[in-house]
Amino acid sequence: EFVFDEHPKPQEIEIFLEGHPQNNLLQHTCWSQVKENWAMKQVVVRRGGTIRAYAMILIRSLPLGLKLFYIPHGPIVNYQDEALIRFFFTKLKKLARRSHAVTIRFDPNLIDRTYPYAKRNEERGDHQQGNVIQLLSTLKCKHKGYTLYLKEATQPRFQAVMLQENMSWEALNAKTRRSIRHAEKCGVMIHEGEDQLNHFAEVMKLTEHRKKI
């Protein structure tokens, strides 16, 4: 039996995210701190006490006491589990109505297709997430389509990924290597790992203010 929990503990959310293949920065609490003009609410679905689904909802106030719900790169859930999806989205819609939210916008962190950058202009087969879109459409969710324009998507649809095993100095192009050397000469220090992500989030926030984003 599924249970919808609107007051999960932060520690258990972090544990759930760390072990989930859809884990991403935009569903962590630190991202809500960057989006300081939005309120935030975290919800989970449990089965047998174990978290099975999670969403960090960013909430924006609109005129007339209305709200906008946005779940960036989420919810984090097994989209192949139809019973779980139906339960979760039913509860999310009830929460939205109770909060006077006029819409729930979300963009799941699912990989539709992968291909080498050099083959980006070649024809490819069918989209891999068609069954997920079909399931969500039965819950009255509207797919915005596979737009190629950034202005028509809340988050970029395309992500350039370099596998860790391929991240060698030799794999970088000459321009990138020159840029790194120039940055090092200017005193920029490069650190790898996750221990300073909170500081990175603060830098993003300062950039947001400076650029008036």
Regions found by a protein language model. Name each.
Residues 5-48:
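N-terminal charged segments
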Residues 84-85, 124-125, 172:
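Charged, low-complexity surface patches
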Residues 11-24, 51-60, 139-155:
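An N-terminal domain-start capping segment
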Residues 84-88, 128, 213:
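Soluble or luminal CAZymes and related metallo-dependent hydrolases
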Residues 32-121:
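Conserved donor-binding loop and adjoining core beta-sheet/short helix segment
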Residues 119-133:
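A charged helix-plus-loop insertion that forms the helical arch/lid used to bind
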Residues 2-8, 129-213:
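Acyltransferase donor/substrate-recognition loop-hinge adjacent to the catalytic core
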